[in-house]
Amino acid sequence: MRRSGPELWKTLTSVSKSGQKKGRRNTRQPVRPLSRFYRIGSSPMKVEFAGLNAPMRLNDESLMTIAEQTEDEIRDLMGGTKKILEERDTGKKKRNREKLHPMERGFSGTQLVGQKLGAPPPVDGVNFDDFETYCLEVKRTSNMTNVFGRVHTMSALVVTGNGRGLAGYAVGKAPIHRTTTAIINGIGMASRKIFHVELHEGRTIYQDFYAECRNTRVFAQRRPRGFGLTCHPRLIKICEAIGIKDIYVKVEGSTKNYLALTHAFVTGLLNQETHQQLAERKGLHVVEMSPSRHFLPQIVASPISTELKTEETLEALDRLNLDDFYGEGRYPLRKPKALPFFSNLEGHLDARWRKHPFRNQESTMIRLIADNMVPRWTRDARAAWAEQRNERMTTGVEPMPLGIGLSHVVPKKDD
């Protein structure tokens, strides 16, 4: 029984209904157009069979003959298949992807997530030329409806800012497989939800704060100039959009819920208060004690419209340190550094005991050289300094130091 080509291919490519549910449909090979590459009854050698691909002759008794071919015909026949394959490859449309600089790439490869997307479009005549936009997340969401069943959509979390305290974030949505549309909708919504963040010295936050959203907990700490951004990769993009340059943020709990992470961090930024606002609310001076000034107090802000409190009117809550004043009494988990395996071995303990008498020698050396008491840390210089100090003590110029094992010289009473 003769069968057609489509019927023969169906025996190789067909899958039952139960097999389609189990994923066997993707394992079947597609239909190959064999007629483009090979014609049944022909071969590269041009073999002729009487009655099949050649006419039958009365006086010809040979059933098979090989036709003579020129070199050009042989070359064209051998290169025909190669030419068809090349035409098939060149017919496909290839996506021309622009090669990005390594510093301009996103969080993963060539994806848009984490890349700079430019300024938002103008809204009601307001331009955002100095703004920069980042896409923090693109994901597929689903919603079960009673009419259409499970409806899938694309969701994009976008943040935009000018790097000087103005920023905004929003979630844009679009139909399934419309990632670009979701990002564009998110950019337009973020440009309509602009908020302002107060920055200390234009680079960091005013005080350490704690914020949470769902199962995401954020501990933000201010840092000195030049520290940089040490935080979650998504928070780095948010800080760049806002203009924060020096900060340390510890994230506990869920670190993959980027919307909750963004909301918690922005909430903590908006709830902080400046030094002047703190001075007005508490009626006290805000004082900074920096090691660069040997911890001498320097007044940063003073109350203007509020009466200044005195020592008698101070309460116990007013005597808190600035680090303990904020944060709702919560502190980030700081695990102690794990001890090495040899910390309690006998040999290591003996070595520490032998080094114990010299434990302060390095700090003493630095102090003596810094105070210009010893010009160089050599034996001759130290001996000369010790001899000079001994002479001053013997002559009474300097008092004799009193410490452990030393006491006042008390004359013995005469009986």
From Swiss-Prot:
Subunit annotation: Component of the mitochondrial ribosome small subunit (28S) which comprises a 12S rRNA and about 30 distinct proteins.
SUPFAM superfamilies: dsRNA-binding domain-like, Ribosomal protein S5 domain 2-like
Location(s) in or outside the cell: Mitochondrion
Pfam families linked to this entry: Ribosomal_S5 (PF00333), Ribosomal_S5_C (PF03719), Ribosomal_uS5m_N (PF21251)
Gene3D superfamilies: 3.30.160.20, 3.30.230.10
Name of the protein this chain belongs to: Small ribosomal subunit protein uS5m
Swiss-Prot/TrEMBL GO biological process terms: translation
Location of region: Disordered: 1-31, 396-415
InterPro entries per UniProt: Ribosomal_Su5_D2-typ_SF (IPR020568), Ribosomal_uS5 (IPR000851), Ribosomal_uS5_C (IPR005324), Ribosomal_uS5_N (IPR013810), Ribosomal_uS5_N_CS (IPR018192), Ribosomal_uS5m_N (IPR048584), Ribsml_uS5_D2-typ_fold_subgr (IPR014721)
Location of the S5 DRBM domain: 131-197
GO cellular component, as recorded: mitochondrial small ribosomal subunit
Record keywords: Mitochondrion, Ribonucleoprotein, Ribosomal protein
Protein origin, superkingdom: Eukaryota
Family statement drawn from the similarity comment of this UniProt entry: Belongs to the universal ribosomal protein uS5 family.
Cystines in this chain: none
PANTHER family, sorted: MITOCHONDRIAL RIBOSOMAL PROTEIN S5
Source organism: Caenorhabditis briggsae
GO molecular function: RNA binding; structural constituent of ribosome
